[in-house]
């Protein structure tokens, strides 16, 4: 009985073979009888006892421990019914899908299956072929897995970014981006080329999310080599840390967050090493630092809120900045509050600045977790799997700039410091460096201080400066490498301000040849006819007067030396009339004839007499003949001087006048006459002072003649200006053949200044060039003055939006050459300063 009780309590032994007992076999406990080994109660035979699965005889006392009876093998498991219901529901949904949706679903299924197997799917393979390959790989006892590990699968795992070749515009259901947007691939490839740089394009939320615009950015990032991608990331890092204003930082933040939003909407795998994912953490700190430049204690103070100190404390916690000092015993409470702040939805904050910074912090935390996990796992990683606050769902493209700049301009307070800081915060700010310190007290090895001259250069505090470049001709010295023709624009580049800051500089490849030649001709004629503009008309007329008077005074001084008491012949009078009709073109004759005087001495006196009889053009610094007789000059330079040698030294006198004129050109004031003018006037005064005593009785006649001379000079100047304007208009409207025709002798003096510079002054290789505005990194000469646009040039801006430089067209007759500008010259180059914003790099 004792043995039976133990067995009853312990149940059957572990070595008891139930299968043998069921089939009638003899077990190891066969020495015991059937009744001794097992006791069955009334109504329960052995088969029912075994089928019930009871392991101990006291099951009647523990009925609640009795297991349920096993179902028949032919009946399906309970979960099979659930799968049938799910498949039936899914089948109904598939019936509602269209052909395009079904194609997208096939691509998604193929991508998921390939991702589950850990290998790269073939884009061209059909889903059925892919399924068969996957099934065969499962039934090959890991042979396929080993081959993948040593073949193409190893290359896939060594990739720095997940493969997104199967994510196409069609598979994602996207549209092509509008044609008015710049090409993303060209923007990234030509990011260091100033010619192809455009203003940032304003793109809407629908265009960014529903087109393939950002998908092209992502694919280009994946295709870049690791070295180029790292350089691009460093460029972005410096751009974020050196942003000139809060507006730029907010725009960069929206750019990064929009890129992440696109990945979340279309469920793209994240590349933790691309441009925008790598720099999202810097955006958070840059935004907080820019906001912290303002008076946050006043900006965050809202009526009815918790106070500015509490809101500022929350703002610092969002940016993971050290909390502000709190009272004793409040460290744990501050830590708990910061934990709650980081887990709150971004839009749950009541202040717009807090919401904007919370959105950036949430995106940065998601990407940071993915970047840390990518160091240990191969991925792929998706934004949806790490968004625990719903920040990616609540964000809309451009939301950061909207939250910040909808609140800051409307802030009103009585704090003067807050208003000054807010004004600076809403506009780009520049450096206020007044002096640069340099240590010149370095000691010698003997210990004595030695004063040295400054060697440190002042930092570039104004990086936004336009850079000018010019293209030299073939005859000049090649010290500066010329820029390529494709990067050349006009000498006065115009940017349409009505286009919202867009760059209207066209591409030479898309411009017709006629339009190209037309603007080339216009660019050259504009430098010749500088006096057509209203701003520089007076200055150019004064310059023309000084230049034309230079040649006339030389001939007049030579006539005085030969004999001023000779009378005028009728031929001289007739030549004077002809030259008066032709304008001031004949003024350059004295210089040409004086150079030929040594070879042809017999013709020098005639030519000088013809030149002396010519009346000078009007000028503010050239007095009339009568006024020169009445007003002797009081300056030492205009005092009477002895007569020059009669006719034996005309060349020496000419050289002396030219040398003195060149020396005086760089030291005289803008309103002062040149040396040639003063000496010519002094020669006239000395010659006329001898005959002034005999002509004193006719002073009234001289006054009347003076008035008539002034009227004639005024009429002549008006006629010349009108003819000059007509000439400029004809040149702008002329064809290429008309522009190539040589200029006849009866033309006006509109191009006299350029021709006379070539005759009177030696050609300088530095000045023989055609200036065109470009962004090539070349320094502008200090003698060139840069002027802003005048309001009166609006019509000219509309007419000449884009001017091109054609290297095949050379200046005609060497007329278009810019002389070296001195501090007193009035030759002014008009340059457009709107290109300064393009030289920030």
From Swiss-Prot:
It is found in: Virion tegument; Virion; Host nucleus; Host cytoplasm. A zinc finger (CHC2-type) spans 298-418. Residues 32-49, 132-147, 568-579, 591-603, 688-699 have a biased composition (Low complexity). Its main location: virion. Residues 495-507, 553-563, 641-657, 708-731 have a biased composition (Basic and acidic residues). Residues 732-749, 793-809 have a biased composition (Acidic residues). Residues 514-526 have a biased composition (Basic residues). GO terms for cellular component: host cell cytoplasm; host cell nucleus; viral tegument. GO terms for biological process: regulation of DNA-templated transcription. The keyword Heme does not apply. InterPro entries: ICP27-like (IPR008648). Residues 66-79, 614-623 have a biased composition (Pro residues). Zn(2+) binds at residues 298, 411, 413, 418. Keywords: Host cytoplasm, Host nucleus, Metal-binding, Transcription, Transcription regulation, Virion, Virion tegument, Zinc, Zinc-finger. Residues 12-82, 115-163, 444-749, 774-811 are annotated as: Disordered. Pfam families: Herpes_UL69. The keyword Zinc-finger applies. One of its GO terms (molecular function) is zinc ion binding. Belongs to the HHV-1 ICP27 protein family. Immediate early (EI) protein that plays many roles during productive infection including regulation of viral gene expression and nuclear export of intronless viral RNAs. This is mRNA export factor ICP27 homolog. It comes from Murid herpesvirus 1 (strain Smith). The lineage of its organism: Viruses, Duplodnaviria, Heunggongvirae, Peploviricota, Herviviricetes.
């Amino acid at each position: 009985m004792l043995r039976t009780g133990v067995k009853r309590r312990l149940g059957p032994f572990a070595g008891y073979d139930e299968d043998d007992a069921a089939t009638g076999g003899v077990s190891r406990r066969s020495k015991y009888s059937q009744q001794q080994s097992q006791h069955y109660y009334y109504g329960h035979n052995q088969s029912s006892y075994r089928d019930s699965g009871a392991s101990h005889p006291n099951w009647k006392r523990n009925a609640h421990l009795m297991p349920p009876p096993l179902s028949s093998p032919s009946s399906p498991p309970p979960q099979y019914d659930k799968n049938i219901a799910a498949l039936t529901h899914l089948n109904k949904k598939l019936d509602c899908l269209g052909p395009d949706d079904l194609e997208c679903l096939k691509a998604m299924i193929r991508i998921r299956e390939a991702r589950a197997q850990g290998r790269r799917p073939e884009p061209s393979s059909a889903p059925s072929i892919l399924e068969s390959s996957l099934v065969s790989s499962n039934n090959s006892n890991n042979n396929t897995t080993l081959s993948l590990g040593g073949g193409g699968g190893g290359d896939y795992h060594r990739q720095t970014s997940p493969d997104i070749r199967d994510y196409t515009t069609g598979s994602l259901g996207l549209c092509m981006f509008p044609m008015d947007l710049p090409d993303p691939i060209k923007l990234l490839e030509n990011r260091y080329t100033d010619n192809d740089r455009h203003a940032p394009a304003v793109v809407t939320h629908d265009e960014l999310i529903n087109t393939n615009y950002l998908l092209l950015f992502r694919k280009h990032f994946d295709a870049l080599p690791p070295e180029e991608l790292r350089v691009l990331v460093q460029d972005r890092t410096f751009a974020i840390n050196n942003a000139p204003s809060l507006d730029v930082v907010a725009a960069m933040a929206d750019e990064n967050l929009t890129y992440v939003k696109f990945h979340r909407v279309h469920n793209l795998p994240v590349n933790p090493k691309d441009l925008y994912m790598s720099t999202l953490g810097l955006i958070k700190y840059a935004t907080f630092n820019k906001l912290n430049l303002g008076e946050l204690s006043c900006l965050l103070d809202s009526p009815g809120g918790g106070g500015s100190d509490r809101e500022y404390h929350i703002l610092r916690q969002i940016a993971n900045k050290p909390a502000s000092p709190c009272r004793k015993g409040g460290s744990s409470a501050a830590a708990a509050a910061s934990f709650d702040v980081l887990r709150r939805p971004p839009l749950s904050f009541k202040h717009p600045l807090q919401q904007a910074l919370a959105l950036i912090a949430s995106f940065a935390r998601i990407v940071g977790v993915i970047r840390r996990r990518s160091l240990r796992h191969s991925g792929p990683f998706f934004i949806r799997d790490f968004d625990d606050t719903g920040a990616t769902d609540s964000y809309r493209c451009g939301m950061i700039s909207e939250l910040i700049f909808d609140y800051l301009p409307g802030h009103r307070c009585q704090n003067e410091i807050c208003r000054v800081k807010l004004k600076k915060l809403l506009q780009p700010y520049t450096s206020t460096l007044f002096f640069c310190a340099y240590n010149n007290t370095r000691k010698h090895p003997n210990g004595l201080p030695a004063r040295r001259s400054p060697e440190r250069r002042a930092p570039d505090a104004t990086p936004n400066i336009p850079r000018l470049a010019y293209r030299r001709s073939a005859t000049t010295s090649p010290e500066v490498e010329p820029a390529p023709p494709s990067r050349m624009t006009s000498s006065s580049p115009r940017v349409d301000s009505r286009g919202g800051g867009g760059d209207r500089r066209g591409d030479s490849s898309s411009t017709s040849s006629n339009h190209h030649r037309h603007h080339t001709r216009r660019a050259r004629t504009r430098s010749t006819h500088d006096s057509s503009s209203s701003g520089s008309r007076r200055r150019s007329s004064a310059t023309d007067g000084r230049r034309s008077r230079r040649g006339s005074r030389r001939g007049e001084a030579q006539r005085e030396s030969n004999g001023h008491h000779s009378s005028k012949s009728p031929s001289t009078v007739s030549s004077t009339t002809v030259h008066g009709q032709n304008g001031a073109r004949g003024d350059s004759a004295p210089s040409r004839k004086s150079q030929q005087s040594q070879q042809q001495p017999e013709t020098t006196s005639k030519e000088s007499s013809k030149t002396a009889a010519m009346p000078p053009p009007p000028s503010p610094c050239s007095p009339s003949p009568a006024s020169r007789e009445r007003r002797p000059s009081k300056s030492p330079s205009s005092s009477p001087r002895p007569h020059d040698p009669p006719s034996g030294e005309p060349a020496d006198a000419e050289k002396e006048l030219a040398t003195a004129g060149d020396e005086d050109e760089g030291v005289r004031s803008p309103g002062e006459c040149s040396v040639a003018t003063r000496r010519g006037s002094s020669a006239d005064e000395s010659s006329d002072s001898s005959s002034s005593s005999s002509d004193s009785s006719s002073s009234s006649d001289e006054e009347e003649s003076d008035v008539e001379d002034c009227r004639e000079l005024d009429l002549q100047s008006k006629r010349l200006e009108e003819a000059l304007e007509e000439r400029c208009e004809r040149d702008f409207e002329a064809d290429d053949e008309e522009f190539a025709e040589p200029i006849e002798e009866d033309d006006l003096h509109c191009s006299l200044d350029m021709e006379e510079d070539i005759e009177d002054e030696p050609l300088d290789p530095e000045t023989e060039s055609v200036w065109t505005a470009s962004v090539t990194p070349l320094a502008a000469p200090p003698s060139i003055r840069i002027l802003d646009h005048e309001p009166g040039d609006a019509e000219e801006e509309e007419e000449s939006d884009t001017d091109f430089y054609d290297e095949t067209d050379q200046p005609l007759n060497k007329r278009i050459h810019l002389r070296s500008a001195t501090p007193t010259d009035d030759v002014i180059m008009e340059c457009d300063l709107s290109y300064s914003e393009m030289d920030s790099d």
